[in-house]
């Protein structure tokens, strides 16, 4: 079977990355959104023919005329009808494949409900009639993309952040940490921060605009208190941004206040540990033989790890915790800890890249894939081939 017949599809909360096995980057990346025309626009826009359902990037251009819904929330599919439209768009419009002649590798966040996987595999066989399907945990794929089998993956996308220890290609679900703070929540927090500054932002229509502001201007401070002080006393942090309608707004301390929620989720009223705490606790809960290897291979993955300053901030926080908790303040011991944070430049599409590598290697080994025949004979029991969720 040639690589053109193996589809890789990483459906995230914010974007769908899809392409073919063995490729170096996704063929198509489009926002995971579905829009339906608002009634009042249906009559008035005769010359601009609106289809019944708009998927992906087209939603952004027409967003004032559409009722936009996001089928995936926090990594879990909430609306399977809408997800069907997204997959239709991916397979037929973007990749232009005939599913019945292809195999597909899908991804799933760790600690996702089993129902999510079951419904996914059911749709792939019943609706699209794929020849073979495999579902892999996202974190493991990120490591494959980095050429590792053992490491600690910190994956932060649009809907969910998780920290997953992987040893020899197996993840540990009982030690995996998950936090519902990621890209979408930071954008939404930035909307709040900007409205406190006096810029009225509409939650839905301006959401994309604010996301662009976030991607262009936000960063993580090395020392939050000092940076905040600097922001209050000087104007050195203020940057201007031109909105699509020509207005210019100034963004100051908000640039690092918004992403700070990744490290201190209390800022947006989410209980639990921040990214550094999760990573540290995760490694300390592993058995002692694996800890040092994990400290040396902390791999960042996903779009919300792209903030400038995030790797150095994470390193500082982890060293502080190690010094306090493990070494009880004895600094000599830090020399032995070779903490290394890997931040590959293409980490935004890391899960997809790992999927393309895995699918490329496995495309000809029948024992790897769940075949249509197995699904028809065993039903959902065939999911055991995919290992643990």
From Swiss-Prot:
Similarity comment: Belongs to the actin family. ARP2 subfamily.
Highest taxon, organism lineage: Eukaryota
GO cellular component entries: Arp2/3 protein complex; cell cortex
Binding site for ATP: 157-159, 211-215, 302-307
SMART domains for this protein: ACTIN
Subunit structure: Component of the Arp2/3 complex.
Main localisation: cytoplasm
Record CDD domains: ASKHA_NBD_Arp2
Primary role: Functions as ATP-binding component of the Arp2/3 complex which is involved in regulation of actin polymerization and together with an activating nucleation-promoting factor (NPF) mediates the formation of branched actin networks. Seems to contact the pointed end of the daughter actin filament. Regulates the directionality of cell expansion by regulating the actin organization, and thus the microtubules distribution and the fusion of small vacuoles.
Gene Ontology MF terms: actin binding; ATP binding
Biological processes per GO annotation: Arp2/3 complex-mediated actin nucleation
A matching Pfam family: Actin
Subcellular compartments: Cytoplasm, Cytoskeleton
Annotated keywords: Actin-binding, ATP-binding, Cytoplasm, Cytoskeleton, Developmental protein, Nucleotide-binding
Protein known as: Actin-related protein 2
InterPro entries named in the record: Actin, ATPase_NBD
């Amino acid at each position: 079977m040639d690589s053109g017949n193996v589809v890789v599809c990483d459906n995230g909360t914010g974007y769908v990355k899809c392409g073919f096995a063995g490729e170096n980057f996704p063929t198509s990346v489009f926002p995971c959104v579905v829009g339906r025309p608002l009634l009042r626009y249906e009559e008035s826009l005769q010359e601009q023919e609106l289809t019944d359902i708009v998927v992906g990037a087209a939603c952004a251009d027409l967003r004032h005329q559409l009722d936009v819904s996001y089928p995936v929330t926090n990594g879990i599919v909430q609306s399977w009808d809408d997800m069907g439209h997204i997959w239709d768009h991916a397979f037929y419009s973007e990749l232009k494949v005939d599913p019945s002649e292809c195999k597909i590798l899908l991804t799933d966040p760790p600690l996702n409900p089993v129902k999510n996987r079951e419904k996914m595999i059911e749709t792939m066989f019943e609706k699209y009639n794929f020849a073979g399907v495999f579902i892999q945990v996202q974190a493991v794929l990120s490591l494959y993309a980095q050429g590792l089998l053992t490491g600690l993956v910190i994956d932060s996308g649009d809907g969910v952040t998780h920290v997953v220890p992987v040893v020899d290609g197996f993840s540990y679900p009982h030690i995996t940490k998950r936090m519902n703070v990621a890209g979408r929540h930071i954008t939404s927090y930035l909307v709040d921060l900007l409205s406190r500054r006096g810029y009225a932002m509409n939650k839905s229509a301006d959401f994309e605009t604010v996301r662009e502001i976030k991607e262009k201007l936000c960063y993580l401070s090395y020392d939050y208190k000092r940076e905040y002080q600097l922001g209050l006393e000087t104007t050195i942090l203020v940057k201007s941004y031109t909105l699509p309608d020509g207005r210019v707004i100034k963004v100051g301390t908000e640039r690092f206040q918004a992403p700070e929620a990744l490290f201190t989720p209390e800022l947006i009223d989410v209980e639990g540990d921040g990214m550094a705490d999760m990573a540290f606790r995760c490694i300390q809960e592993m058995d002692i033989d694996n800890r040092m290897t994990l400290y040396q291979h902390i791999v960042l993955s996903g779009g919300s790890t792209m903030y400038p300053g995030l790797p150095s901030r994470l390193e500082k926080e982890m060293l502080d915790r190690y010094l306090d908790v493990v070494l009880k303040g004895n600094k000599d011991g830090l020399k032995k800890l070779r903490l290394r944070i890997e931040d590959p430049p293409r980490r935004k599409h890391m899960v997809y890249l790992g999927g393309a590598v895995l699918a490329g290697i496995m495309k000809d080994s029948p024992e790897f894939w769940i075949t249509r025949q197995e699904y028809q004979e065993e039903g959902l029991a065939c999911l055991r081939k995919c290992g643990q969720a």
